[in-house]
Each structure stands twice: as structure tokens, then as C-alpha cells.
Amino acid sequence: MTLSDTIMEQLEAVRQASRNIVTLSDQNINKVLEDLAGRITSSAQAILEANRKDLEKMERSNPMYDRLLLDEKRLEGIAADMRNVASLPSPLDITLEERTLSSGLSLRKASVPIGVIGIIYEARPNVTFDVFALCLKSGNATVLKGGSDADHSNRAIAELIHTVLQDHGISPDILYLLPSEREAATIMMEAVGKIDMIIPRGSQQLIDHVRNTAKVPVIETGAGIVHTYVDRDADMEMAKAIVLNAKTRRPSVCNALDTLIIHSDRLGDLAELCRPLSEHQVIIFADKRSYLELLPSYPATLLKHAEPEHYGTEFLSLKMSVKTVDTLDEALSHIATYSSRHSEALITRDNAVKAEFFKRVDAAVVYHNASTAFTDGAQFGLGAEIGISTQKLHARGPMALKELTTYKWMIEGDGQTRPL
């Protein structure tokens, strides 16, 4: 059999298995997730050994290294997320709308699973756990195409999940990890009738490739080109804490700060605002005015002149750009030009500026006086997430349980027929 034949045969098995998930009670699903959470801890050494094999192939300086890395603390966090998903209410069979027509027909619109969800992602083995938990809880089967950089990790995780499913009498076909060959992703993206929806998680290049190649419907979980605008009426102590957190907490994730925009009236505060960043070795690409302001105090090895490409870049590392503006309109224009519509933040005490910013910024998540690091399903109280959708159709922002369902109309009658 060819690779395509093998994959399509397995995808049909996934499709068949997906039809049986709806027969599982929420109680049964929760038991699977709670059992898996316990096994993550007890099987930690096997998972970490597989992860070490992947890490050995990657340079520590690679921005993806931190995303690839698993350790006992991160596995404990994944297990906690698994238990959290189990504790959440089921998103299925929720009545969204209900009415009785003049004909006597009773209509009920209720949430149902999407079916088979495909995920294409890069070197993030934690995604394998997160996606499985969310898809199972929402009644969906899962097809995964992880990055080759994390292949050992993903295979170990999938093997553990399959073992737990079999122990609970559930077909392991509800989770299918595709072969590592690049061709497998193309076969997946063209599997109309087998896969209902594909979600890419990773770089803008990956997302663009999936959007341009897939025949299966796609929901984009976007690269984060994230801005924070420090207004003329900002509290600078607050701004200093927020900027530091947004940039340095986890610089390799999509909600990390990429461009600091500062009002020209507050340029005199820029050196103090950026001082904590230098302690974290953050490289700053500054425009002319901010460069001159930072030059006397910011370490010369960390201060660079900004080039056009430094705006609209998702750095995923300890790098950021600085843009000086004279007005709110100029800040909004810059954001509109370069934003990936992921997360954007404003720091100000001016409520009129806040209202204008909230109204005019086109992004999935818009902040006032808070770090963009909060763009996360768990932080929103949604449990783990599939990703952050930057598009407007079906889902926007953190994609958690509700976003992994669709709906159907159920109509009850008493023999009604429609008149000619």
C-alpha cells in the first residue's frame, strides 16, 4: 500500500470511531481524562526520555527549544490541565435556542460535536495532550500531524493515550497521529469527507501553507504580532511591570510582546521603562527618536536601529521593537498595519482613550492596563485551548470546548405536513 492508501484507510477508521464518541457519557469521558492525568505523572520518565531524544537534535539557541522542552514540572501542569478539563461542564447538548412554530412543530437548536478535527502543529508536544483532552471532552475524534522535531515525544504521548483508551473500552482510533513524512500533512489537508476541520498551530509560514493548500475547512490560530501602546496618560510604574511581563515571562509564545508603542510625550520615561528589560538581555530595535532616548542608558550591545522588517515580526525570543507616535490615531494606524489581530494592549488612565482603543482595534483580544500574557484559554477560565483563533468566522480568541462544537436543529412534530 502507498502512504496515501495507508493514511486514508486509517482516516476512515477514525471517522467510524468518531460516531461512537457521542454514545459516551460525560462521566465516562471524565474518568478517561482523570486516569490519563494520573498516568502522565506515573509515566513521566518514559515521556521525558522520548523528549530528550528530540531535544538532542535541536540547538538550545533555537526559539523552538523552549516549546519542545518537557520536564516534570511541565508534565505536572499538563496533568492539572487534564483534570481541569474533566471538571468543566460538558459543552454538548446545550440548548441554544428553542421555539414552537404556528404549525405546532417544536424546534430545538443544540450543541453537537464537529466530528473529526485535524491539528497541524510544530514542536510543541504539550499540544498533543491538550488537543486530545479538549476534543474528547467535546465529543470529537482527533487527527494529529506534529512537527518532526517532536516526533519521539508525540509518539510516546500517543502510545500512552491509546493505552488509557483501551483500558476504558474505547477505540484508540479516536486519536490518530500521522506518520512523520511531510507528504502526510498534504494527504490530511485534502481528506475531504474524512476530516471536518483543520486547525494549524505554529508559525505564520505554516498557517499560510495550510490555508493555501487545504481542501478541508481551516480555522487559523494565528501567529501573534503583539503590540502594547503606552499612552501619554499612562501610569509608568504600571507600564514598566506590564511590558516586562509581556515580553519576558515566556518570550517564545504567541501572546508575548513584539512591539512597544510609546507616545512622544512620554519618551523621557522610556529609559526607565526599558531598564528591567536589559536585565533580561532583551534586544531592542528602536526607531530614531526612541533610539536617541535609550542610547545613554541601554546597553549598547542590546540596542539596535529598527529596520522596516522589525515591525510586523513575531520575534518569539528576547527581542522587541519600539515605535514612537505623536497621537492615538498614529498608534492605531500602526497597529492596524502590522497587527496579526491576536492580542493588543493599551496602558492609560484616560477613559476616553480606552474607549477609542477598544472600539477601533481589530483583534481577538484587546487589553487595557494588563499584560497580553493573559491570552490563554486556562487564564480565561476555559480550560486548556486548541489555540488562539485570529479569524472572525466560527471562533475568535481562545478556542476551548465551546468552539469545538457546532449545532443542529431537532424538530418534533405530531404528524404535521407542509401545505402545497
From Swiss-Prot:
Pfam families from the UniProt entry? Aldedh
CDD domains, alphabetized? ALDH_F18-19_ProA-GPR
UniProt keywords (A-Z) are:
Amino-acid biosynthesis, Cytoplasm, NADP, Oxidoreductase, Proline biosynthesis
Cellular component aspect of the GO annotation: cytoplasm
**GO MF entry, a single one:** NADP binding
Looking up InterPro entries in the UniProt record yields: Ald_DH/histidinol_DH, Ald_DH_C, Ald_DH_N, Aldehyde_DH_dom, G-glutamylP_reductase_CS, Glu-5-SA_DH, GPR_dom
- Annotated EC: 1.2.1.41
Entry's transmembrane regions: none
Keyword Protein transport among record annotations: no
Catalytic reaction annotation: L-glutamate 5-semialdehyde + phosphate + NADP(+) = L-glutamyl 5-phosphate + NADPH + H(+)
Where is it localised?
Cytoplasm
Q: Which GO terms describe its biological process?
A: L-proline biosynthetic process
Annotated pathway: Amino-acid biosynthesis; L-proline biosynthesis; L-glutamate 5-semialdehyde from L-glutamate: step 2/2
Origin, by domain of life? Bacteria
User: What family does the Swiss-Prot or TrEMBL record give for this protein?
Assistant: Belongs to the gamma-glutamyl phosphate reductase family.
Q: What does this protein do?
A: Catalyzes the NADPH-dependent reduction of L-glutamate 5-phosphate into L-glutamate 5-semialdehyde and phosphate. The product spontaneously undergoes cyclization to form 1-pyrroline-5-carboxylate.
Instruction: Quote the protein name from its UniProt record.
Output: Gamma-glutamyl phosphate reductase
Q: Which gene encodes it?
A: proA
